[in-house]
Amino acid sequence: MANYGSANVSAYTISATSGKLKPVAGSPFGAGTNPSGIAIDPKGTFAYVANSGSDNVSAYSINATSGKLTPVAGSPFGAGSVPQWLVIDATGKFAYVANYGSANVSGYSIDATSGELAPVAGSPFGAGNGPNGVAVDPTSKFVYVANEASNNVSAYDVETNGVLTPVAGSPFGGVTLPIGVAVDPVAKFAYVGNYGSDNVSAYTINATSGALTPVAGSPFGAGTLPLGVAVDPTGKFAYVANFGSGNVWGYTINAKTGKLTPVAGSPFGAGSGPWGIATCRVVKGKCKPPPL
């Protein structure tokens, strides 16, 4: 967990039976200034943190037994201005960081042995104003960035070397102060939380080009000031953290159209100012990441 105000990262072990969290020995671990976004590679070997106050990315190796974090050689690695969210592709080969202050996206290749980051050719790549949330589709073919200040979503084709190329028609509209962005497990739909209009925009993804087309009926109502968006590993449900109303909206996803319908009992209570949100698949009582 990235602790924005204390410039460090908290790490926990998870009880397989109760789900309770216990701090890892040595936690919290030092990071840069104002750490915000955090991501772990698909194999659970490395962790990366975007430090929005020091314009860099901290990288750590994860001890498989204890969960202890150890900075990798060369960490922290330079980023753009005010890096916010970051994501790692499903192959674990590349990482992408949305730089809010410099209106671009930093792309890195990940050394499979050391975890070190190296900028891919041409990085950083231009985005809209105030890029915030970033997502990679499960096939690692496309990257999507929510541009909060320009009210649109940038879409990129990912080349084999990690280089990003804007897809035809990018950026795509239909959003208002977009923050969080998520893609479903089969790369068919994308969802964006609109902080400025209290709703969620839904798009179909062209499997060949990566272009976005608004789903019929989009945007769909949410709570007040929606931020984080997540789709469960089955692709049947979507969830939105509403910062202003202190709750979580849950939706069923129409598998054919991508349309969102609130689930029974939605919204569900949360703490004050919920922001990030994530889901996992439960296997024999344990939370597991989606299969690669």
Residue ranges and their predicted role:
Residues 1-292:
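Predominantly soluble domains enriched in secretory-pathway, periplasmic, or organellar proteins
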